[in-house]
Curated annotation (Swiss-Prot):
SUPFAM superfamilies listed in its UniProt record: beta and beta-prime subunits of DNA dependent RNA-polymerase
Species this chain originates from: Streptococcus pyogenes serotype M1
E.C. number(s) listed in UniProt: 2.7.7.6
GO molecular function, one term: ribonucleoside binding
Record's keyword terms, sorted: DNA-directed RNA polymerase, Nucleotidyltransferase, Transcription, Transferase
UniProt-recorded name of the protein: DNA-directed RNA polymerase subunit beta
Lineage: Bacteria, Bacillati, Bacillota, Bacilli, Lactobacillales
Length: 1188
C-alpha cells in the first residue's frame, strides 16, 4: 500500500502521500488580524496618546497630560449587535491630568472617549449589524532609497529619496553635467552643497573633507552660487532653501532656520516611525557598506593604538565580524561642529572610512556612516542627511547598490492595529487644536479636563474609517474559505497606497521575495491583478510589519539540517542560500547528495550542500491557504490554478456537503481557523448536546455553554448553519470541533460533492465547457443550497399622520390576507411568491378638495379607502420562498430606532435552490462550466456494474488549458471511492504517478484507469474506453436565478424617459448604436422606428400604443422621442436658436409633456393605472355576463 495514515481531528483519517515530514505546524491562520488588534489595545493606543499629549496652551501656563485608559464592558453582546443593527463596541474611558503651571494645581479626571469597535474572536468587526473586515495594506516602507536611471544619451545618473512615515520628502539627483542636486518636498532643485552649508558646514574645503574628493562634489561646488568665504554662507543657503519652499514670502535667517527644523528635525512634524529608523540605520550603516571592499588605510584602535586591520585588506564578512564591536563603538568616529548659524548647532558625529575605488584602483573613496543613532530618534538627524549624501556620491564610484522597490524588504504590511492607530492619531490631532483654543480662552481656575476635551473629532475619525474606508470591507461570507482568505488578504490599494490606473507591470508581478511570504497564485483576475494578494500559509509579520517566513537552520559545522526554526524577512534572506524542502536527507539529518537545488537572491540553481544555510520548512509555504487546497497543484498551469483558488472562494454552502475524497490535508486546518465552526475553548466532558447548544463540564467543575447558530443569513445571502458533532458523554479537548460550520463535514472544509465524472462528449451538449448532469443530483438534493433574503418595512410619522401596520388594506381581497396575522404581518412558515404581502402597511394621503355633498357623504359612511393608500411590503421579483423568521422592533420595547421611525419589521425568506440549467459549476483546477442539460438518470451513460455517471465533461477542455491535475484527481478519486478511503495529496509533495498507479491497481481498476461505458438510451457500449472517476465539483455563487430577467412594462428614467437598465431596476435591454446600425443595414425601417419610439422614449406614443393594444384598435403613428426634445432644450440652453421644420419649412411644435391639448391622449403617471382601469372594465364585463 502506497502512502501512510494521518489523522485530522477526531473525525477523519486520510491516507497521505507526503514524503517530507512536517517540522513546524501551521500558525493560527487569522493571527495577522487578532495579534495586530491585540497589539493596538496593549500598546498602540497608548503610543498614540503619548505622541499627541501633553498639550499646552499658547501661553504655556496650562498643560493637559495623558495618564491611562480603560475599556469597559460592551453595551451589546455579539448576537444582540447583529439583531439590532448596532456595532459591537466597548466604551473607552481615558484619564487626563490638567496641570496649572502657575499655581501648581493638578486636576485628574476620567473622560468618556466614545465607543470603540472591538474585534471578535473570529478577527471581524460588527459595524451597524454587518460583519466587516479590515484588510491589511501593503505599502512602501519608510526609509532611504537609491535608484539609477539612464538618460537619452545613455549616461547613467543616480537618485535618492528619504521617505518618512509622515513629513517632507528629501531627494537627491544627478544631471547630465555631473552636478548633484537636492529637492525638498518636491520643490525646485538646488545644489546639494546648499543644504550641506545650511547644516552648518559652509567652507568648500570642509565639504570636501567630509565627503572626500570626487568629481560630483567638485562640480557642484563650482555650480554653487554662495562664493563668499564666511559663515554667512550658511545664512544665504538657509534663505535660498526658504525661497524654494515658500516662494514670494519675505525671508529672514531665523524664519528660514525654523522652517527647515520643522521640516526635518522636529519629531512632531517629521516621523520616520520605528520601521523608518530601522531601515535608515540598516542602509547607511558602515558595516554593510564596507563588505567586500578593500580598505585604503590602517584601522587603528584609538585607545590602545593597535592596528585592527591593515590597509589593502579585503573586508570580508569574517573580517568585519572580527572588528564588529569596534565598528559599533568609536572606530573612525569624527565629530564635526557646525557653525553658529547652522540649523542644528549640536556636534554631528560621523564614521568615516577610506576604501579603494572599485572602478579605479589608484583612487580612494570616502564612505561616511551615520554612526547609528538610537532607535528612539524618529526624526532625521544632520548625520543621516550627510550619510545619505555620501552613499549617493559613492554610487557614482561603483560602491553600494540601488534598491528594488518591489522587493518585500522595502514593502511592509499595515495591519488592522496600525491602521486604527493612524486613524485615532488623526482624530486626536484634530482634537488637539480644539483643546488648545479652549485652554487659552477659558478661565484657568474653573477648567477641568472634561470641559476642554471634545471627543467628536476622534469618534468621527474612527467611525469614518470603519464605515467608508477602502480598507474596511463587508466580509466575503460565501463560505469559510472565503472568510479566511478575506482576513489574510493584502491590498496595495487604499489611502497612502497605489491606484489601479497608476500601477504598472512591475508592481503587480511576482517577485522572488514573495516566496513563502505572498502567494504567487491567489490574486484576482482583472484590473486588480497583482495589487491584491494573499499571505502565504506560513507567513507572519515581525514588529516592523515585514513578512517573515520560517526556515530550518543548517549547522554549517556538521552539515546537519536541524529542527531549529529561524524566521527571516526578505532582506535578511538575501544574505543566505536556502535549499528546497524536498532536498533528500540522511537519517542523521545531513544532505544525502553533494549538490542540492536552492535559491540565493532570486537565482534558482544547484548549489554545493556545504554552502546551504537554511532549508524550507514545508513545500506548501510558497502558497496561500486556498491554493494549498488544490490537489495536484504541481500538475496545473498557473493561470488555471489561479482560477481554481479564486473559484473555491465562491462555492455556495450545500445542504449536505461532503469533504473531498482527494484532499490536500489543508481542509482541516482551514475549517478550524476560519471562525465558522464552534471550537472547544477548554478540555472537558459533554453533559448536554442538542441542535442549538452544547454544554461542557470542565475538569475544574465549571460549565461552558456553546450556542450553535441555525440558519442565520450570511453577508452573501447564504444560510449560515452549524451542525453539532459531539454527543453527551464525549470527552473534548481544547481546540476540538464541537460543531461544523457551513460547508464543513466532520471538521473538514467541504465546499462541494464527489460525483462520478466521465470525460466524454454527448450529443454536443458539453460544447464550450458546458456541463451535462444527471437528474439524480437534482432529485437527491446533492447540489441544493438554502438562501436567505431579508426584507424590511418601517412605519414613520408623516405630515398627514403616522403610517400604520395593519390587516385592513384598501382594495385587497381576503385571499391576499390569508397568511397575515391580526397585526398584518406574515406568519412564519408561510409559502410566499412574487407580489404577496409580507407586511400590510397604510400611509395617510392628502385629501383632495371635496365638495360639501361629498364631505357629507364621507362623514356619514366613513369611507376609509379614500384617506389611506396601500404601501405594504410585498415579495419582490425572484423572492419566492418560505418565511423563516420575523423580527419586530418598536420604541415601546426599548429598541433603538432611527429618528422618525416608530416600528420596524424584518422578514426573512428562505429559498431552497436546486441545481438547474444555467447554474455555474467548477472543479478545483480552474475547470469551470455552465450546466447545459439535466438528463434523466436512465439516459445517462453507465459503468459495467450499472452505476450511472453523474456528470459529463468535455475532454477538449483539458489539453489546451494544461490543468492535468483534474485528470489525476479523477483517477485517484475513483480508487479512493472503490477502497472506501479518503486521501491527502499535499501540494508539491503529493502522490507521484507511481503512487497513483499503485493505488489504482489496489482498487482493482483497469491498468489504464479507463473503462467501457454503455449508452443509457440504447444499452450499447460506446466505441472507445472513457476516463471515468470521482472529481470534486462545487456549485458557484453565480446562479441563474439571480441573473435571469425579463421586462414588459416598467420604470422609466426621469430626464430621458427611456427605460432604466439592469435587473435591480427591473430595466430593459439597451439597444445601442451598433444594434441600430445592424437594423439599418437590413433596411428594417419599421422595426427600427418602433424600437426608437414606442419601446423607448416616445411618451405619448407608447401610451397611445398601450391603449390601442388593450382595446384592440390599430396602433397610431409614433411621435417625437423625448431624448430629441432633451437635445433641443440643451442646445437652446447654450443660446442656440434651435427649431424643427417640416418638409414645407413650417415650424413643428415640440409640445411639453404637461401641456395636454389633446383630450384623447392618456396622461398617466405610470402604466399601472391604465392596467387597473383595464382590469376593472374587464371585471365589470364579466360580472354583467354572469348576471345574464
Amino acid at each position: 500500500m502506497a502512502g501512510h495514515e494521518v489523522r485530522y481531528g477526531k473525525h477523519r483519517t486520510r491516507r497521505s502521500f507526503s514524503r517530507i515530514k512536517e517540522v513546524l505546524d501551521l500558525p493560527n491562520l487569522i493571527e495577522i488580524q487578532t495579534d495586530s488588534f491585540q497589539d493596538f489595545l496593549d500598546s498602540g493606543l497608548k503610543e498614540v496618546f503619548e505622541d499627541v499629549l501633553p498639550i499646552s496652551n499658547f501661553t504655556d501656563t496650562m498643560e493637559l497630560e495623558f495618564v491611562g485608559y480603560e475599556f469597559k464592558e460592551p453595551k451589546y453582546t455579539l448576537e444582540e449587535a447583529r439583531i439590532h443593527d448596532a456595532s459591537y463596541s466597548a466604551p473607552i474611558f481615558v484619564t487626563f491630568r490638567l496641570v496649572n503651571k502657575e499655581t501648581g494645581e493638578i486636576k485628574t479626571q476620567e473622560v468618556f472617549f466614545g465607543d470603540f469597535p472591538i474585534m471578535t474572536e473570529m478577527g471581524t468587526f460588527i459595524i451597524n449589524g454587518g460583519e466587516r473586515i479590515i484588510v491589511s495594506q501593503l505599502v512602501r516602507s519608510p526609509g532611504v532609497y537609491f535608484n539609477d536611471k539612464v538618460d537619452k544619451n545613455g549616461k547613467v545618473g543616480y537618485g535618492s529619496t528619504v521617505i518618512p512615515n509622515r513629513g517632507a520628502w528629501l531627494e537627491l539627483e544627478t544631471d547630465s553635467k555631473d552636478i548633484a542636486y537636492t529637492r525638498i518636498d518636491r520643490t525646485r532643485k538646488i545644489p546639494f552643497t546648499t543644504l550641506v552649508r545650511a547644516l552648518g558646514f559652509s567652507g568648500d574645503d570642509e565639504i570636501v573633507d567630509i565627503f572626500g574628493e570626487s568629481d560630483l562634489v567638485r562640480n557642484t561646488i563650482e555650480k554653487d552660487i554662495h562664493k563668499n568665504p564666511s559663515d554667512s554662507r550658511t545664512d544665504e543657503a538657509l534663505k535660498e532653501i526658504y525661497e524654494r519652499l515658500r516662494p514670494g514670502e519675505p525671508k529672514t535667517a531665523d524664519s528660514s532656520r525654523s522652517l527647515l527644523i520643522a521640516r526635518f528635525f522636529d519629531a512632531r512634524r517629521y516621523d520616520l516611525a520605528a520601521v523608518g529608523r530601522y531601515k535608515v540605520n540598516k542602509k547607511l550603516n558602515i558595516k554593510t557598506r564596507l563588505l567586500n571592499q578593500i580598505i585604503a588605510e590602517n584601522l587603528v584602535d584609538a585607545e590602545t593604538g593597535e592596528i585592527l586591520v591593515e590597509a589593502g585588506t579585503e573586508m570580508t564578512r569574517s573580517v568585519i565580524e572580527s572588528i564588529e564591536e569596534h565598528l559599533d563603538g568609536d572606530l573612525n568616529k569624527f565629530v564635526y561642529t557646525p557653525n553658529d548659524y547652522a540649523v542644528v548647532t549640536e556636534p554631528v558625529v560621523l564614521q568615516k572610512f577610506k576604501v579603494v575605488s572599485p572602478i579605479d584602483p589608484d583612487r580612494v573613496v570616502t564612505i561616511v556612516g551615520n554612526a547609528n543613532p538610537d532607535d528612539k530618534v524618529r526624526a532625521l538627524t544632520p548625520a543621516d542627511i550627510l550619510a545619505e549624501m555620501s552613499y549617493f556620491l559613492n554610487l557614482a564610484e561603483g560602491l553600494g547598490k540601488v534598491d528594488d522597490i518591489d522587493h518585500l524588504g522595502n514593502r511592509r504590511i499595515r495591519a488592522v492595529g496600525e491602521l486604527l492607530a493612524n486613524q485615532f492619531r488623526i482624530g486626536l490631532a484634530r482634537m488637539e487644536r480644539n483643546v488648545r483654543e479652549r485652554m487659552s480662552v477659558q478661565d484657568n481656575d474653573v477648567l477641568t479636563p472634561q470641559q476642554i476635551i471634545n471627543i467628536r473629532p476622534v469618534t468621527a475619525a474612527v467611525k469614518e474609517f470603519f464605515g467608508s474606508s477602502q480598507l474596511s470591507q463587508f466580509m466575503d461570507q460565501h463560505n469559510p474559505l472565503s472568510e479566511l482568505s478575506h482576513k489574510r488578504r493584502l491590498s496595495a490599494l487604499g489611502p497612502g497606497g497605489l491606484t489601479r490606473d497608476r500601477a504598472g507591470y512591475e508592481v503587480r508581478d511576482v517577485h522572488y521575495t514573495h516566496y513563502g511570504r505572498m502567494c504567487p497564485i491567489e490574486t484576482p483576475e482583472g484590473p486588480n491583478i497583482g495589487l491584491i494578494n494573499n499571505l502565504s500559509s506560513f507567513g507572519h509579520l515581525n514588529k516592523y510589519g515585514f513578512i517573515q517566513t520560517p526556515y530550518r537552520k543548517v549547522d554549517r559545522a556538521t552539515g546537519t539540517v536541524t529542527n531549529e526554526i529561524v524566521w527571516l524577512t526578505a532582506d535578511e534572506e538575501d544574505e543566505y542560500t536556502v535549499a528546497q524542502a524536498n532536498s533528500k536527507l540522511n537519517e542523521d539529518g545531513t544532505f544525502a547528495e553533494e549538490i542540492v537545488m536552492g535559491r540565493h537572491q532570486g537565482n534558482n540553481q544547484e548549489f554545493s550542500a556545504s554552502v546551504v544555510d537554511f532549508v524550507d520548512v514545508s513545500p506548501k509555504q510558497v502558497v496561500a491557504v486556498a491554493t494549498a487546497c488544490i490537489p495536484f497543484l504541481e500538475n496545473d498551469d498557473s493561470n488555471r490554478a489561479l482560477m481554481g483558488a479564486n473559484m473555491q472562494r465562491q462555492a455556495v454552502p450545500l445542504i449536505d456537503p461532503k469533504a473531498p475524497y482527494v484532499g490536500t490535508g489543508m481542509e482541516y486546518q482551514a475549517a478550524h481557523d476560519s471562525g465558522a465552526a464552534v471550537i472547544a475553548q477548554q478540555n472537558g466532558k459533554v453533559v448536554f448536546s442538542d441542535a442549538e447548544k452544547v454544554e461542557i463540564r470542565r475538569q475544574d467543575g465549571s460549565l461552558d455553554v456553546y450556542h450553535i447558530t441555525k440558519f442565520r443569513r450570511s453577508n452573501s445571502g447564504t444560510a449560515y448553519n452549524q451542525r453539532t458533532l459531539v454527543k453527551v458523554g464525549d470527552i473534548v479537548e481544547k481546540g476540538d470541533f464541537i460543531a461544523d460550520g457551513p460547508s464543513m463535514e466532520n471538521g473538514e472544509m467541504a465546499l462541494g460533492q464527489n460525483p462520478v465524472v466521465a470525460y466524454m462528449t454527448w450529443e454536443g451538449y458539453n460544447f464550450e465547457d458546458a456541463v451535462i448532469m444527471s437528474e439524480r443530483l437534482v432529485k437527491e438534493d446533492v447540489y441544493t443550497s438554502v438562501h436567505l433574503e431579508e426584507f424590511e418595512s418601517e412605519t414613520r410619522d408623516t405630515k398627514l399622520g403616522p403610517e400604520e401596520i395593519t390587516r385592513e388594506i384598501p382594495n385587497v381581497g381576503e385571499e391576499a390576507l390569508k397568511d397575515l396575522d391580526e397585526m398584518g404581518i406574515i406568519r412564519i412558515g408561510a409559502e410566499v411568491k412574487e407580489g404577496d404581502i409580507l407586511v400590510g402597511k397604510v400611509t395617510p394621503k392628502g385629501e383632495k378638495d371635496l365638495s360639501a355633498e361629498e364631505r357629507l357623504l364621507h362623514a356619514i359612511f366613513g369611507d376609509k379607502s379614500r384617506e389611506v393608500r396601500d404601501t405594504s411590503l410585498r415579495v419582490p421579483h425572484g423572492g419566492d420562498g418560505i418565511v423563516r423568521d420575523v423580527k419586530i422592533f418598536t420604541r415601546a420595547n426599548g429598541d433603538e430606532l432611527q429618528s422618525g421611525v416608530n416600528m420596524l419589521v424584518r422578514v426573512y425568506i428562505a429559498q431552497k435552490r436546486k441545481i438547474k440549467v444555467g447554474d455555474k459549476m467548477a472543479g478545483r483546477h480552474g475547470n469551470k462550466g455552465v450546466v447545459s442539460r439535466i438528463v434523466p438518470v436512465e439516459d445517462m451513460p453507465y459503468l459495467p456494474d450499472g452505476t450511472p455517471v453523474d456528470i459529463m465533461l468535455n475532454p477538449l477542455g483539458v489539453p489546451s488549458r494544461m490543468n492535468i491535475g483534474q485528470v489525476m484527481e479523477l483517477h485517484l478519486g475513483m480508487a479512493a471511492r472503490n477502497l472506501g478511503i479518503h486521501i491527502a495529496t499535499p501540494v508539491f509533495d503529493g502522490a507521484s504517478s507511481e503512487d497513483l498507479w499503485d493505488t489504482v491497481r489496489e482498487a482493482g481498476m483497469d491498468s489504464d484507469a479507463k473503462t467501457v461505458l454503455y449508452d443509457g438510451r440504447t444499452g450499447e457500449p460506446f466505441d472507445n474506453r472513457v476516463s471515468v472517476g470521482v472529481m470534486y465539483m462545487i456549485k458557484l455563487h453565480h446562479m441563474v436565478d439571480d441573473k435571469l430577467h425579463a421586462r414588459s412594462v416598467g420604470p422609466y428614467s426621469l430626464v430621458t424617459q427611456q427605460p432604466l437598465g439592469g435587473k435591480a431596476q427591473f430595466g430593459g435591454q439597451r439597444f445601442g448604436e451598433m444594434e441600430v446600425w445592424a437594423l439599418e443595414a437590413y433596411g428594417a425601417s419599421n422595426v427600427l422606428q418602433e424600437i426608437l419610439t414606442y419601446k423607448s422614449d416616445d411618451v405619448t406614443g407608447r401610451l397611445k400604443a398601450y391603449e390601442a393594444i388593450t382595446k384592440g384598435k390599430p396602433i397610431p403613428k409614433p411621435g417625437v422621442p423625448e431624448s430629441f426634445r432633451v437635445l433641443v432644450k440643451e442646445l437652446q440652453s447654450l443660446g442656440l436658436d434651435m427649431r424643427v421644420l417640416d418638409e414645407d419649412d413650417n415650424e413643428v411644435e415640440l409640445r411639453d409633456l404637461d401641456e395636454g391639448e389633446d383630450d384623447d391622449i392618456m396622461h398617466v403617471d405610470d402604466l399601472e393605472k391604465a392596467r387597473e382601469k383595464q382590469a376593472q372594465e374587464t371585471q365589470e364585463v364579466s360580472e354583467t355576463t354572469d348576471e345574464k
